[in-house]
Amino acid sequence: MSEKPLTKTDYLMRLRRCQTIDTLERVIEKNKYELSDNELAVFYSAADHRLAELTMNKLYDKIPSSVWKFIR
């Protein structure tokens, strides 16, 4: 049985367990070495989404473009 790759939404739901930016950065650092390049691109997209949520202290389905200026 082959595993199907996780989607951005799958990664985002897992990353929502991270309650602080520090924890999120630790998870990103760990996954940097464990995921393939294709999986990493999807993971980084979800991680950026979660970083925006943590920075604004709100959950978003889609991040408004105005929020990105607050993300480092």
UniProtKB/Swiss-Prot annotation:
- The annotated site for Interacts with H-NS falls at 25, 48
Q: Which UniProt keywords apply?
A: Repressor, Transcription, Transcription regulation
| Knockout mutant characteristics | Deletion results in a large increase in the production of extracellular and intracellular hemolysin. At low osmolarity minor changes in overall translation, at 0.4 M NaCl expression of about 25 proteins altered, including decreased OmpA, crr and AhpC (in strain 5K, not a K12 derivative). At 0.3 M NaCl in strain W3110 up-regulation of 113 genes and down-regulation of 8 genes was observed; a double cnu-hha deletion up-regulated 134 and down-regulated 5 genes, most of which are thought to have been acquired horizontally and are also up-regulated in double hns-stpA deletions.
Annotated consequence of substituting residue 37 to N = Does not affect H-NS binding ability
The protein's matches in Pfam families, at most eight in alphabetical order, are given as: HHA
Q: Its Gene Ontology biological processes?
A: regulation of DNA-templated transcription; regulation of gene expression
The Gene Ontology CC terms held by the record are: cytosol; H-NS-Hha complex; transcription regulator complex
User: Superkingdom of the source?
Assistant: Bacteria
An annotated Gene Ontology molecular function: DNA binding
Stated induction or repression of this protein's expression:
Expression is autoregulated. Induced during biofilm formation.
Identify the InterPro entries for this entry. Answer: Hemolysn_expr_modulating_HHA, HHA_sf
Substitution effect: residue 39 to Q: Does not affect H-NS binding ability
The record lists the effect of residue 29 to Q as: Does not affect H-NS binding ability
Q: What is the effect of changing residue 48 to E/R?
A: Abolishes the interaction with H-NS
Alphabetical list of NCBIfam families matching this protein: PRK10945.1 (NF008191)
Q: What does this protein do?
A: Down-regulates hemolysin (hly) expression in complex with H-NS. Stimulates transposition events in vivo. Modifies the set of genes regulated by H-NS; Hha and Cnu (YdgT) increase the number of genes DNA bound by H-NS/StpA and may also modulate the oligomerization of the H-NS/StpA-complex. Binds DNA and influences DNA topology in response to environmental stimuli; does not however interact with DNA in the absence of H-NS. Involved in persister cell formation, acting downstream of mRNA interferase (toxin) MqsR.
Q: What else is known?
A: Hha and TomB may form a type II toxin-antitoxin (TA) system.
- What does the comment on domains in this protein's record state? Histidine-tagging (His-tagging) at the N-terminus does not impair interaction with H-NS, whereas His-tagging at the C-terminus does impair interaction.
Q: What is this protein called?
A: Hemolysin expression-modulating protein Hha
| Organism this protein belongs to | Escherichia coli (strain K12)
Gene (UniProt):
hha
